[in-house]
């Protein structure tokens, strides 16, 4: 049977395409009969010799299920051939809806042929990005003495020095370093892991439950105190979660921040050989910080340029996937403006497609070291072991594709920035910070 189906276009809207296929019933019947004959030739059934089962009996037994298999196979064969031979470019996603089943599968009236619709989205034509036509800010910051002083103040705050308090009338307050011993009990029984000797922490840093820290405020060196403490339901130690326990706490040692008013002492406390070494450390640190901030500003400027300069029809299916990811990432309060969220998802997809076009044209590819570096910075630095993240990368395809996509996008952005024209601008640290915060 040469022409066993006909096809007509039913949808052509932006990237969406739709085609209706009508397959002759005779073709379906022929395929079903072939399969049933194959079963009859090999079937073993009570009352029949092998290969002697009547075709009518086989059709009654297996006809409906075989017809379903044939329909599925016919749809797959026709659709695959149609998409392969059609000039559609890349296919984003496709779906089939059966409009009418063949008569062999049902008691439908008419000629009984199979009718189904194949709908799909095609990949858009993405324009070539003109890297030579891009100009980005290259920011140079003039580091002032005030910037260095501010850096050293941060250094002093981040690496505080403490001195013991001998005044027994001095109560504990925020910022003090406290050494305590404590024990806990639930219904009169000691809790596993609920006691410690010589435990040291800085009050107000969130190292302990807020309710616990509030009870410590005002206590004096050598003082003991008993109080009830309720652990939250989501507390990481499950045998504490949701319990109200009896606590007994003793303050063993109290230290306060030692005010350092000269650079020589600060340099010595922080392990520098000299004040000059410390100032060089500060200057180098500021240069790195400002370079990172300038890089973020350039990236934002690049993405804004691409968004404003190029138009791309984005596939709805990919936008819906991106929107789903965004909803999972955002807090509930950020989900109210559905229109703005959809617009951002469309923008992300558009920029991603432009960057992938650059990657393809320029031969930018993801290397193993790129992935390891990305994981080290974005996951391992936040308490996840490299081994755990790599295991997740190996076993979860969605996570693997997410990481590879982010790595490639970052690499392409750096590639474009390195080749774009530069508008060198000199500014103060304050001006750069304002620009950075507006990104």
From Swiss-Prot:
Enzyme category, top tier: isomerase
Membership in a protein family: Belongs to the FKBP-type PPIase family. Tig subfamily.
Pfam families: FKBP_C (PF00254), Trigger_C (PF05698), Trigger_N (PF05697)
GO cellular component, as recorded: cytoplasm
Reaction catalysed by this enzyme: [protein]-peptidylproline (omega=180) = [protein]-peptidylproline (omega=0)
Organism: Anaplasma phagocytophilum (strain HZ)
Top-level taxon: Bacteria
A GO biological-process term: protein transport
Chief site of localization: cytoplasm
Subcellular location: Cytoplasm
Record's protein name: Trigger factor
EC id: 5.2.1.8
Domain PPIase FKBP-type residue range list: 175-260
């Amino acid at each position: 049977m040469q022409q066993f189906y006909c096809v007509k276009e039913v949808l052509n809207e932006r990237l969406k395409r739709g085609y209706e296929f009508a397959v002759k019933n005779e073709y379906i019947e022929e395929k079903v009969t072939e399969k049933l004959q194959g079963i009859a030739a090999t079937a073993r059934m009570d009352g029949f010799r092998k290969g002697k089962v009547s075709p009518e009996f086989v059709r009654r037994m297996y006809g409906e299920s075989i017809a379903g298999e044939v329909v599925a196979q016919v749809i797959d064969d026709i659709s695959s051939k149609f998409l392969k031979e059609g000039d559609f470019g890349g296919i984003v996603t496709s779906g089939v809806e059966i409009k009418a089943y063949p008569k062999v599968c049902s008691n439908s009236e008419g000629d009984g042929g199979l009718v189904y619709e194949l709908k799909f989205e095609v990949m858009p034509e993405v324009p070539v990005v003109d890297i030579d036509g891009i100009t980005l800010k290259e920011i140079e910051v003039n580091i002032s003495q005030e910037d260095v002083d501010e850096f050293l103040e941060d250094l002093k705050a981040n690496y505080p020095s403490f001195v013991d308090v001998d005044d027994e009338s001095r109560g504990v307050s925020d910022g003090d370093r406290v050494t305590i011993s404590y024990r806990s009990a639930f219904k009169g029984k000691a809790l596993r892991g609920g006691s410690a000797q010589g435990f040291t922490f800085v009050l107000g840093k969130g190292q302990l439950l807020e309710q616990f820290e509030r009870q410590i405020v005002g206590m004096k060196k050598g003082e003991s105190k008993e109080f009830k403490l309720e652990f939250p339901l989501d507390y990481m130690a499950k045998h504490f979660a949701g319990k109200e326990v009896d606590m007994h706490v003793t303050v063993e040692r109290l230290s306060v921040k030692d005010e350092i008013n000269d650079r020589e002492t600060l340099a010595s406390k922080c392990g520098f050989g000299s004040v000059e070494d410390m100032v060089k450390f500060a200057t180098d640190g500021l240069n790195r910080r400002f370079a990172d901030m300038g890089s973020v500003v350039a990236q934002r400027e690049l993405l804004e340029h691409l968004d404003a300069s190029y138009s791309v029809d984005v596939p709805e299916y990919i936008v819906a996937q991106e929107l789903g990811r965004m909803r999972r990432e955002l807090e509930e309060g950020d989900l109210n403006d559905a229109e703005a969220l959809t617009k951002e998802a469309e923008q992300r997809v558009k920029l991603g497609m432009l960057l992938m076009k650059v990657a393809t044209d320029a031969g930018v590819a993801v290397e193993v070291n790129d992935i390891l570096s990305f994981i080290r910075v974005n996951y391992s630095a936040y308490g996840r072991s490299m081994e755990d993240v790599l295991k997740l990368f190996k076993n979860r395809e969605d996570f693997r594709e997410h990481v590879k996509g982010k790595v490639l996008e970052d690499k392409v952005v750096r590639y474009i920035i390195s080749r774009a024209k530069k508008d060198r601008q000199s500014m103060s640290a304050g001006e750069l910070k304002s620009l950075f915060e507006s990104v």
